[in-house]
Design a protein with these regions (language model features):
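Active-site-adjacent structural elements that line small-molecule/cofactor binding pockets in enzymes
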Residues: 1-308
Length: 308
């Protein structure tokens, strides 16, 4: 098993650079493999943009892998995003993990000039163009439905070859098939229940076999929202308050977190592992950086040892 931790992104009362630097270096000391952000451009809580924060985090760390799960890449220009990904991978000396998804549901595509009728096709084509930009070819030619590029010089290239690992977020069977076709790994959403994740993993494994992909080379992870508290009822209240800050009143979200005493949380995480997770992205939902730091310490000392 591999364990990663979320990187706090909330920026309400001002950015606490020293506090976050201490959090990141402590995550390395505690042995977490990675630190991950998420993307939410429009939402009820102000969050620092993920890639920019990862670039800052790269300067604060030396071994921690740096990830985002997930970027809604259909909302971004692919060449600009490819350049940003390259920059963060180079600044971190090859430590970036890139999570992608086309979006859907309540996404306000029109605000970004994206056609809701074609966003999935545009997403897939955009990912193909990004891979072309990251390739060893010094000049890129690409002709698609949405974009035309002729003999365009693109440099530099990412440190990781052929590109940073691409993690897909997906729930529907067709989306999972797309993840296997175009991705390197799968990250179950924090907003999905353990049972929904288990179902997705079964579909994923079937797709890996049907597409003749090596299941040992396709890593499976899940973001898990959680709170550890000696009072189980208080833990539940705290984790639900955290979910409201991220998702507002999204239906069904109350069923997704793991909360309670250290034993309760270990039990809930064991269920996620049994469902197929090889990487756990542990996402405390404290009310601020200090609470998230305390949660990280408790996870490392009281929960993870029960899982190993």
């Amino acid at each position: 098993m591999r364990y990663s931790i979320s990187i706090p992104q909330t920026d309400v009362d001002g950015f606490d650079g020293e506090g976050l630097r201490s959090y990141l270096t402590r995550a390395e000391e505690l042995g977490f493999e990675g630190g991950w952000t998420l993307e939410q451009v429009i939402g009820p809580t102000p969050l620092i943009a993920p890639m920019e924060l990862l670039a800052w985090a790269a300067a604060c760390t030396t071994t921690l892998r740096l990830g985002v799960a997930v970027m809604i890449t259909s909302l971004h220009d692919p060449l600009q995003l490819a350049a940003t990904v390259t920059a963060v991978d180079r600044l971190s000396h090859g430590r970036l993990d890139l999570g992608v998804a086309p979006g859907g549901g309540r996404r306000k595509f029109e605000a970004f000039g994206v056609d809701p009728a074609t966003f999935i096709s545009s997403f897939t084509e955009g990912l193909q163009l990004m891979k072309a930009a990251w390739s060893d070819e010094p000049r890129v030619t690409f002709h698609g439905r949405f974009r035309d590029v002729d003999d365009l010089p693109i440099s530099p290239k990412p440190v990781q070859r052929p590109h940073p690992p691409i993690w897909f977020g997906a729930n529907a069977p067709r989306a999972i098939a797309r993840a296997v076709r175009h991705g390197d790994a799968f990250m179950g959403a924090g907003s999905s229940t353990t049972q929904d994740f288990a179902t997705a993993v079964q579909i994923l494994r079937t797709e890996l076999a049907e597409q003749d992909k090596d299941p040992n080379a396709f890593r499976i992870g899940k973001r898990v929202y959680l709170i550890v508290d000696d009072d189980a009822a208080r833990a539940r209240e705290r984790v639900l308050a955290g979910l409201r800050r991220i998702y507002g009143s999204m239906p069904g979200v109350d069923a997704v977190p793991v909360a309670g005493t250290p034993d309760d949380v270990a039990r809930g995480l064991r269920e996620v592992i049994d469902a197929g997770a090889q990487t756990l992205l542990l996402n405390p939902l404290g009310a601020g950086l200090e609470e998230d730091r305390e949660q990280m310490e408790r996870l490392a000392a009281e929960v993870i040892p029960q899982l190993d």
